[in-house]
Amino acid sequence: MSQLRAVPKQEWRRFFDGMSKELLGKRAEIEVSSLDLGDQIISEWVPMIGITYDHGDDLLDIALEGGNHMIRHPREIVVEYAPMGLSSVAVVDAEGTQQVVRLKEPLVLPPATSK
């Protein structure tokens, strides 16, 4: 059974910086869902380089081999944990578009700690 966890905005940078090394080379797909576009897979099982959040530009940068996918002004981030680890990251941007990064194999992360 999977578990969802909303990541508070003040933790975004630390959360993604902490997992970026573990993401290197992991295969991911990105699906974008909006009322205007419907559901579209924009990257299919491409090796990842990492994910970073830039507070100054309010930008989530998903680095993949062959190019980056940038989400400007993210409003909400929810991660899904499967029994074997983190399986997806769902991001809703300021316009209400949902973008989901799914990992082909769950990512085992150390337990989250709040500071």
Give the label of every model feature segment.
Residues 2, 11, 30, 113-115:
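Mixed-charge (acidic/basic) macromolecular-recognition segments
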Residues 2-24:
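N-terminal leader/targeting segments and the immediate start of mature chains
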Residues 24-33:
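A short, Trp-centered hydrophobic/proline-enriched beta-strand micro-motif
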Residues 37-47:
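Short coil-to-beta-strand transition motifs
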Residues 52-57:
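Short, conserved beta-turn/loop elements at beta-strand boundaries and strand-helix junctions
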Residues 60-62, 91:
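SH3/SH3-like beta-barrel fold
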Residues 62-73:
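Short solvent-exposed strand/turn elements
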Residues 73-115:
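Helix-rich interaction surfaces within compact, conserved domain-sized segments
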